[in-house]
Amino acid sequence: MQNIPPQVQAMLGQLESYQQQLQLVVQQKQKVQLELTEAKKALDEIESLPDDAVVYKTVGTLIVKTTKDKAVAELKEKIETLEVRLNALERQEKKLNEKLKELTAQIQSALRPPTAG
């Protein structure tokens, strides 16, 4: 790294930072996708039950009785919230990928030996 100009060293530091941010965003996105899949499966299952079915939900460490309508409404709200979060994470991931691509090109350009003209 001694022969690398300070400007390029700074860009490399920024590149590493973007890579770490991207890794976190991807992990969060995977977690949200998993939660969304589980919530949709639960909603499908509950909607297939008769209207007078007894439904339970977990609240912290407790399991409490609720109505089918309440459970459906809560799951739909949760799904909507997760979809909004997932869209935000996808936008963030796209922006970070664009920044990484741009910065990588800048670094490569800065490290390229000047051509004799």
Curated annotation (Swiss-Prot):
Domain of life the protein comes from: Archaea
Chief place where the protein resides: cytoplasm
Entry GO MF terms: protein folding chaperone; unfolded protein binding
Annotated GO CC locations: cytoplasm; prefoldin complex
Pfam families (alphabetical): Prefoldin_2
The entry's keywords: Chaperone, Cytoplasm
GO biological process, one term: protein folding
Transmembrane residue ranges: none
Record's subcellular location: Cytoplasm
Cystine bridges: none
Keyword Transit peptide tagged: no
Family annotation (Gene3D superfamilies): 1.10.287.370
NCBIfam families: gimC_beta (TIGR02338)
Family: Belongs to the prefoldin subunit beta family.
Assembly and oligomerization: Heterohexamer of two alpha and four beta subunits.
Functional note: Molecular chaperone capable of stabilizing a range of proteins. Seems to fulfill an ATP-independent, HSP70-like function in archaeal de novo protein folding.
Name the UniProt record assigns to this protein: Prefoldin subunit beta
Organism: Thermococcus kodakarensis (strain ATCC BAA-918 / JCM 12380 / KOD1) (Pyrococcus kodakaraensis (strain KOD1))
Native organism taxonomy: Archaea, Methanobacteriati, Methanobacteriota, Thermococci, Thermococcales
